[in-house]
């Protein structure tokens, strides 16, 4: 199964909502429970963000194989973030492909 990479920042309210959405999706069970997510803190792990340089501005941003699947936008509420995180999880697919 492919891994999602989520670039985030400590203290970011949109990142907190993305984590909340991930927890909710995993709690549903099934394929969502198995989706691996690699969390990268933009401030503490700058070297790990280098492959994504120029591909995002806002956090959280979610990537799969270097392709951006989601980038939060100012003002997004939990429902919008949940829908976008779910879309990213769905992109992984149950067999590890899109």
Q: Which functions belong to the PLM regions below?
A:
Residues 1-28:
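Local sequence-structure signature of Cys/Sec-based thiol-disulfide redox active-site neighborhoods
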Residues 2, 34-38, 98:
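Residue-level recognition of the N-termini of beta-strands and the immediately preceding loop/turn
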Residues 8, 32-47:
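Thiol-based oxidoreductase modules, predominantly thioredoxin-like and allied folds used
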Residues 11, 44, 68:
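Short, glycine/acidic-enriched loop or turn micro-motifs at the edges of active sites
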Residues 19-22, 30-34, 51, 64-67, ...:
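Non-catalytic interaction surface on structured domains
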Residues 26-32, 92-96:
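Alpha-helix termini
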Residues 52-59:
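A short, structured beta-strand/loop element
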Residues 58, 64-97:
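Non-catalytic, surface beta->alpha helical segment in thiol-disulfide oxidoreductase systems
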